[in-house]
Amino acid sequence: MLQRWLGAPKLGKPRRQRPQRIARYFDCTWVTAWGEERARVSSLSLTGCYIESRFSVPPDGEEVRDLTIALPTGSVNLQGTAVNATSGVGFAVRFIDIDTKTQKSLSAFISVAQR
């Protein structure tokens, strides 16, 4: 118990590191069966984001196509899967198939934004 309080590392399984995440607002768009939707991203990491959308919330597991996030360094185009959807609030997107260029630009932006 004293070791935990002092911040000593625990023995056993190492903890999985959580992805770096920034909590800022960015405009975004994505394509649904009904056309282009507009909303804002409130949390962003290398593995996903949270989109606040009161009107258009896809069900869990649905593919989010052509997601474009407008960052100060330029827009990034991504795709992913909707998770943790809450109607009238928003949903998380778990990114899939990120190309190397997008990964590098997203990583560089997140590193700078966390300083």
How should each PLM-predicted stretch be described?
Residues 44, 83-85, 98:
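Residue-level recognition of beta-strand microenvironments
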Residues 39-40, 78-83:
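Short beta-strand-centered aromatic/proline hotspots
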Residues 1-46, 54, 107-115:
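N-terminal helix initiation/capping motif
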Residues 35-37, 72-76, 89:
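Short acidic/polar mixed-charge low-complexity motifs
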Residues 55-63:
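Surface-exposed connector loops and short turns at secondary-structure junctions
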Residues 99-104:
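Short, charged/polar, Gly/Pro-enriched secondary-structure boundary elements
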Residues 50-53, 86-97:
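Short, solvent-exposed secondary-structure boundary/capping segments
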Residues 26-32, 62-75:
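Short conserved beta-strand and strand-loop elements enriched in small hydrophobics
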